[in-house]
Amino acid sequence: MKTDTPSLETPQAARLRRRQLIRQLLERDKTPLAILFMAAVVGTLVGLAAVAFDKGVAWLQNQRMGALVHTADNYPLLLTVAFLCSAVLAMFGYFLVRKYAPEAGGSGIPEIEGALEDQRPVRWWRVLPVKFFGGLGTLGGGMGLGREGPTVQIGGNISRMVLDIFRLKGDEARHTLLATGAAAGLAAAFNAPLAGILFIIEEMRPQFRYTLISIKAVFIGVIMSTIMYRIFNHEVALIDVGKLSDAPLNTLWLYLILGIIFGIFGPIFNKWVLGMQDLLHRVHGGNITKWVLMGGAIGGLCGLLGFVAPATSGGGFNLIPIATAGNFSMGMLVFIFVARVITTLLCFSSGAPGGIFAPMLALGTVLGTAFGMVAVELFPQYHLEAGTFAIAGMGALLAASIRAPLTGIILVLEMTDNYQLILPMIITGLGATLLAQFTGGKPLYSAILARTLAKQEAEQLARSKAASASENT
């Protein structure tokens, strides 16, 4: 019987096949691999920058409070020093922004969104130092601002710096790394990697170009930035509120009511922010001296409040555990809420380098706690815990204001480590988002970006008219 024997590959054929395989690998486009490698570099640098920024803010705040200790015996002098220390730090931040990089003012997140749409420039060589040191001044002075805005804008600008240094070309690389830097900045600011990823997918969904390479790059950047954060900090929840009880199913309707309240308040808060921007702009009129002095007055006011009523100023992270634990009376909660709304509007709308995430988390906590205390009194049969409403409220204002409910929910869960409250948080966030959309107003960052682009267009038109007039003469 005749059997077939397999033909053996000759050594020459094997060598030829290996050469063809090597040639194919060498000729293959290396751009995706380069982007992923650059994403790791960007994430590492952003994480280190976020850690340095956080440590710098903490050091300045400690130095400022240490200076007050030496004047504790003289109350009028103590108040004067409290005002001046914060005012000088704030004026330093305002001056840097106004003089050297106006685009570094405010949150910075709308600037990154505009850059992703190719409508705003990314001048990293001036934004990075101004945002970093200007943010140190305003946040170190105790103003009612958050650190996530600076770290997101710093992250986006670091990505552009890496692109320029390594001369990586192409729109895909630029767009992908810009989104990676922004996500890494948010993740490192709050030790919340999943929230950083969702922030890009949800909040920046109109600008983010979703591809397999871009989402992998965002993942890698967020992982590296979070690792850098955790190397220099502990792997614990950023805000320690303890383990709260779960929400029984028969109480979930209360969280929907809470979401409706935030759905009403969110668009109103956005209108207040934009209205305060207009009011403060009329005050300084674009004059750098008036603008810096106005910023100093706002910063000094926050410094005074930080000494007299600490719960009413600053980013609000120290307030959240105290409010969640139920250590404030209803009257005190109302006072803190009103005072923090005012300080947040003044600080953020004035163009100070700083974010609004953290202040909104604090406002949501206070309003949620107040609602929880009322619910505890009205429905004793439910055996409610006011702290669960505080946690649900933390992300609800974000959902209503910037229309990013998933980001708000996951951010709060990662920050507080109370994952058992995910269902009431989803209900609260959904109620807040749906009602905010129904009432009309635009998301806060979108409205701010639209204003920035309108101002940019007006300035370009004015320059073109001036150029035409000079040519005619």
From Swiss-Prot:
It is a multi-pass membrane protein. Residues 109-116, 177-189, 193-201, 387-401, 402-404, 405-416, 417-421 dip into the membrane without crossing it. The record marks 148 as: Mediates proton transfer from the outer aqueous phase to the interior of the protein. Residues 70-76, 233-252, 310-329, 377-386 are periplasmic. Keywords: Antiport, Cell inner membrane, Cell membrane, Chloride, Ion transport, Membrane, Transmembrane, Transmembrane helix, Transport. Chloride binds at residues 107, 356-357, 445. The record marks 203 as: Mediates proton transfer from the protein to the inner aqueous phase. A motif (Selectivity filter part_2) lies at residues 146-150. GO terms for molecular function: antiporter activity; voltage-gated chloride channel activity. It comes from the Bacteria. A motif (Selectivity filter part_3) lies at residues 355-359. InterPro entries: Cl-channel_ClcA (IPR023861), Cl-channel_core (IPR014743), ClC (IPR001807). It holds the Pfam family Voltage_CLC. It is found in: Cell inner membrane. Belongs to the chloride channel (TC 2.A.49) family. ClcA subfamily. HAMAP family: CLC_ClcA. This is H(+)/Cl(-) exchange transporter ClcA.
